[in-house]
A protein has these predicted regions:
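C-terminal domain-tail junction helix/linker
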Residues: 71-72, 113-163
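RNase H-like two-metal-ion nuclease catalytic core shared by retroviral integrases
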Residues: 61-63, 70-73, 86-109, 118-130
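Short, structured coil segments at secondary-structure junctions
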Residues: 80-82
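Short, surface-exposed connector motifs at secondary-structure boundaries
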Residues: 20-24, 50-57
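Active-site beta-loop-alpha junctions of metal-dependent nucleic acid enzymes
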Residues: 25-50
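Short conserved beta-strand segments at catalytic cores or DNA/RNA-binding microdomains
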Residues: 1-24, 28-29, 40
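An acidic- and aromatic-residue-enriched active-site/binding cleft used to recognize and process polar
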Residues: 18, 31, 64, 91
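Short acidic, Gly/Ser-rich segments with clustered Asp/Glu that frequently serve as metal-coordination loops
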Residues: 4-6, 64-69
Length: 163
C-alpha cells in the first residue's frame, strides 16, 4: 500500500506485473483485508480466471495486515481453484520486491509524501495509472508498459483490466 500520512482515510493499493512493468493502482478508503480480496475478485471477474492466473501467477507483498485473507486472495470465487500464489517478503527487506519499490517511487511524483490523498477520486487515480501505462520504460527498451501488455495479451484484455 502507498499512503501519505497516517491520518489519511485514503490509501493507494499498488501492484506491478514485473515482466511488463505494468502497474495497477486503486484508491481505497480505510481498507481492510476484505477490501483487498474484493479488489482481486473484481479483476478476476473482469478478465476471467485463466487471464488472472496468467497475469498474476504470484503476488509478492509485505506483511501488511490487509493481505491476511490468504485464501480470499489466492482462491477464485468463480472456479474455487487456486488463481495465484501469495508470498510475503521479510520485514524491512525492500530488496525482495524491487519492482514494487520502483513503482512506489514513481507514484510519489504524483502523490508526494506528507501530502494528503483524501481529496483524490478514483478517477484521479485511474488517470495516473493510465499515464504510467503510456510512459516509456528503459528496461522495456523505451517501449511503454501498455505496448508490452497488449503485445503479450491484447488490447481487449487491457481494456477489461481497467474497468
Amino acid at each position: 500500500f502507498l499512503g501519505s500520512i497516517t491520518t489519511d482515510n485514503n490509501t493507494i493499493l499498488s501492484l506491478i506485473q514485473p515482466d511488463m512493468q505494468f502497474p495497477l493502482i486503486e484508491l481505497m478508503t480505510n481498507p481492510k483485508a476484505i477490501d483487498v480480496t474484493k479488489f482481486f475478485d473484481k479483476i478476476e471477474y473482469n478478465i476471467g480466471f485463466d487471464n488472472f492466473k496468467r497475469l498474476f501467477p504470484v503476488i509478492l507483498t509485505d506483511r501488511d495486515p490487509r493481505f491476511t485473507d490468504i485464501d480470499g486472495i489466492t482462491i477464485s470465487k468463480i472456479t474455487g481453484a487456486e488463481r495465484c500464489k501469495l508470498f510475503f517478503c521479510d520485514p524491512y527487506v525492500s530488496s525482495q520486491k524491487p519492482n514494487v519499490e520502483n513503482l512506489n517511487k514513481r507514484l510519489r511524483r504524483y502523490f508526494p509524501k506528507r501530502k494528503s490523498i483524501d481529496n483524490l477520486t478514483k478517477k484521479d487515480v485511474k488517470k495516473v495509472c493510465e499515464s504510467l501505462h503510456i510512459k516509456p520504460v528503459k528496461i522495456l527498451d523505451h517501449y511503454t508498459p501498455k505496448d508490452a501488455f497488449t503485445k503479450i495479451f491484447s488490447e481487449e484484455l487491457y481494456n477489461l483490466l481497467l474497468k
